[in-house]
C-alpha cells in the first residue's frame, strides 16, 4: 500500500512562523523611545525699566506681552524685586504658586555662603513627590498702596478717617497731595456704596496744598476715577485714584501708567499734613499698587542682611508654579549680572510633573 502525506500542514506552519517573525520585527521597530527627562533652564531677564515676562517650559523663554491682564502667554512676570504669576488678579492664565521655603529661616552667614552652584542640589532634589495638593497653591491678589481705609463689609462697614495718605505724582514734576476716607454708607457685601473722601493737592510743584475738597462718590454702579485737581473724571482721562467695590487703586504700578504712588500716615492728623511736611518723606517710602501672592508673602530674597551692604541676597527658595496639570519648579539665583548691574534676574526652572 502506498501512503501519501499532504504537504499543506507543513506549508501552513512555515507561513505562520514567518508571519510571527514579521510581527515581532514590526513590534520591535514601532517601539517608541521614552520621553526625554525635563531639562533645567536658566535665563536672565532685564527687570529694570518694565516688567519682563517668562513662559515656563522645556526650556523656559522670555515672551513679549502687550496686555498682561488679557494674555495667557506668560506664566511669571518680574519687575525689580517683584514677581507675579499669571492668575487671580494678575492675569487670566490660571497660574498658581506654592513655596517650599526650605531657606526661610537661613542665617546671615548661611545666606552669604549660598551660590547658584551649591544650591543646585536642593533644586534637583525637588521631585513630583514634593508637590502638594492643588488646593495648596494660590493665585495673585491685588496689593493696593491705599488699603485699610474701611473695616467690615455690608451694614458693618465703617470708614477709618484716622488713616491719611500722602499721594505723589512722579510723571514730570513731582506733585504731592493728601487723601482720606471719612465715611461710607449704603455698603453691600461687594461694594462700599457711597464713599465720602477729603483731599487736597499742590497746584504746582513746591507750592502749598490747595483748599481741601470733600466729595461723596457712589462706587456701587462701577469704578469712579478721581483726579485730585479736577475731581471725578472718565477712565480715559488722567486720573490719580480709582474707587471700585472695596478697593482704591492708584494710577501707578500694576494699576496704571500715571506714576502715582501713596504713603500711609496714620500718626499725623489730616489737617496737620501740609505740603512742606509731605515733602520730607523720601521717595523710596512711597508704594504703588502691586500683586501679592506667594512671592510677596514668602519673598525670594533678603535685603541689607549685614546692616550696611544695601544688597539683595537671594535665599534660593524653590517655588512650585502650576499651570493646569503641569507643575514647574523655579529658583531665583541672582539679582545682579556679572558687572554688578541690578534688576537682572536669573531664574532656574524645570518641569516637575
Where does each model-flagged region fall?
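Bacterial N-terminal signal peptides that target proteins for export
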Residues: 2-16
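Surface-exposed, beta-sheet-biased, low-hydrophobicity segments with strongly acidic/polar composition
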Residues: 31-353
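C-terminal motif of bacterial Sec signal peptides marking the signal peptidase cleavage site
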Residues: 23-26
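Sec-dependent N-terminal signal peptides
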Residues: 17-21
Amino acid at each position: 500500500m502506498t501512503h501519501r502525506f499532504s504537504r499543506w500542514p507543513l506549508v501552513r506552519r512555515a507561513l505562520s512562523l514567518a508571519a510571527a517573525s514579521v510581527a515581532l520585527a514590526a513590534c520591535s521597530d514601532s517601539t517608541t523611545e521614552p520621553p526625554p527627562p525635563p531639562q533645567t533652564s536658566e535665563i536672565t531677564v532685564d527687570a529694570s525699566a518694565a516688567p519682563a515676562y517668562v513662559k515656563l517650559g522645556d526650556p523656559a523663554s522670555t515672551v513679549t506681552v502687550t496686555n498682561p491682564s488679557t494674555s495667557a502667554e506668560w506664566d511669571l512676570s518680574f519687575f525689580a524685586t517683584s514677581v507675579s504669576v499669571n492668575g487671580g488678579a494678575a492675569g487670566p492664565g490660571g497660574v498658581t504658586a506654592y513655596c517650599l521655603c526650605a531657606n526661610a529661616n537661613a542665617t546671615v552667614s548661611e545666606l552669604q555662603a549660598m551660590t547658584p552652584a551649591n544650591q543646585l542640589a536642593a533644586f534637583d532634589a525637588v521631585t513630583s513627590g514634593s508637590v502638594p495638593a492643588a488646593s495648596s497653591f494660590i493665585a495673585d491678589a491685588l496689593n493696593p498702596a491705599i488699603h485699610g481705609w474701611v473695616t467690615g463689609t455690608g451694614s458693618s462697614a465703617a470708614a477709618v478717617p484716622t488713616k491719611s495718605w500722602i499721594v505723589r505724582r512722579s510723571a514730570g514734576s513731582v506733585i504731592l497731595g493728601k487723601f482720606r476716607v471719612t465715611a461710607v454708607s449704603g455698603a453691600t457685601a461687594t461694594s462700599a456704596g457711597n464713599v465720602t473722601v477729603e483731599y487736597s493737592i499742590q497746584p504746582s510743584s513746591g507750592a502749598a496744598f490747595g483748599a481741601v475738597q470733600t466729595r461723596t462718590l457712589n462706587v456701587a454702579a462701577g469704578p469712579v476715577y478721581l483726579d485730585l485737581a479736577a475731581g471725578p473724571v472718565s477712565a480715559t482721562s488722567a486720573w490719580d485714584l480709582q474707587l471700585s467695590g472695596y478697593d482704591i487703586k492708584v494710577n501707578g504700578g500694576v494699576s496704571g501708567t500715571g506714576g502715582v504712588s501713596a504713603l500711609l500716615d496714620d500718626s499725623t492728623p489730616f489737617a496737620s499734613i501740609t505740603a512742606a511736611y509731605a515733602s520730607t518723606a523720601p521717595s523710596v517710602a512711597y508704594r504703588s499698587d502691586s500683586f501679592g501672592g506667594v512671592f510677596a508673602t514668602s519673598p525670594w530674597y533678603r535685603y541689607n542682611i549685614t546692616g550696611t551692604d544695601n544688597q539683595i541676597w537671594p535665599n534660593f527658595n524653590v517655588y512650585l508654579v502650576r499651570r493646569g496639570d503641569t507643575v514647574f519648579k523655579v529658583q531665583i539665583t541672582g539679582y545682579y549680572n556679572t558687572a554688578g548691574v541690578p534688576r537682572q534676574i536669573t531664574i532656574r526652572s524645570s518641569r516637575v510633573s
